[in-house]
Amino acid sequence: MEFNILNQSPVLNGHSVEQSLGHTTELAKLADRLGYKRYFVSEHHNMENVIGTSPEVLVTHLLNQTKNINVGAGGVMLSHHNPFHVAEQFQLISHLAPGRVNLGVGKAPGGTPLATDALQHELRPDIDSFNDRFLSLKSFVDSTHDNHKVLKISVDTESSKPDLFLLGGSLSSAKFAADNEVNYIFAHFIKNDENLLKEVASAYKELYPGGKFIAALSVLLTETEKEKKAAKEENAVYSLKFKDGRTLRVTTEKQVNDYIKNTDEKIEVEKSQLDMILGTKDEILSKLNELSNSCPIDEFMFHLPTADADLRNLTVEALAPIHTIHKEKAGIL
């Protein structure tokens, strides 16, 4: 079983923004040394205490700081971006580090309504649906679009290209990924529904047995009940439920108030705690083993929901696949 890290680059306790970004880099180096397969960074906008706004910038930097680990976006929020330009960016990055670049793509806005309005201000009103934009991006990456002979994202799209992943949390998105033969990352740390995880994993693998199905989970090493309690207290979750059925999850009261102030929509707010896998190394591995035996998961991705730098490091060290042997891959970086 392969293990991966998702780092949302939070502002850490007692750290400046620059120091927190430094920790994002150091954690990538640590994961690289310890045999993790992938290290993903996210895209968020106008979010309190979250730094990562530009995964393409961080991915390029982290590839330069590591040797073996795959580095990727987890993910590019495609509703804010031109699919052709995203394909160009990650094709270029892939030329810098062949075989190590992953492009995860998500549908969520990754930020507040104000940020979404700012990011999409100049986009045409009849913006394509997410599925259309994703298929457009895939066609550029795969060189299968209608104008592929004259419109290219690079002078060379054969020697190296990014591995493409769809990020999602529903049966429909998993089926969409499988139908289009794209790897899939299920955001279990958002959905927190094991029955749904099993249903989605089984459906995806049935439709696309050759695809990678990755379950992204919230995981923290906690040795005592006191540490477990502290982790739970740090991770309150607010679900914003919109009239049209949409649900958005945020982690602070300020974010809740910002959403309410910046929209005319009626919103129902529900407070709960983030569902996490907490415990000792053996307890966490036992739970992961239970999940992998109950549904066809290819890899796990660990989201570390804490602003405590030491706890983040300890969790990554404790769960390290240190017996995995990696051959260093060639590249310019």
Regions found by a protein language model. Give the residues of each.
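Acidic (Asp/Glu)-rich catalytic clusters
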Residues: 32, 59-67, 94-101, 144, ...
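Flexible, glycine-rich active-site loops centered on histidine and acidic residues
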Residues: 2-17, 80-144
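Active-site mouth loops of central-metabolism enzymes
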Residues: 7-21, 76-83, 158-168, 272-281
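Hydrophobic faces of well-ordered beta-strands that scaffold small-molecule active sites
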Residues: 3-7, 39-41, 71-73, 101-105, ...
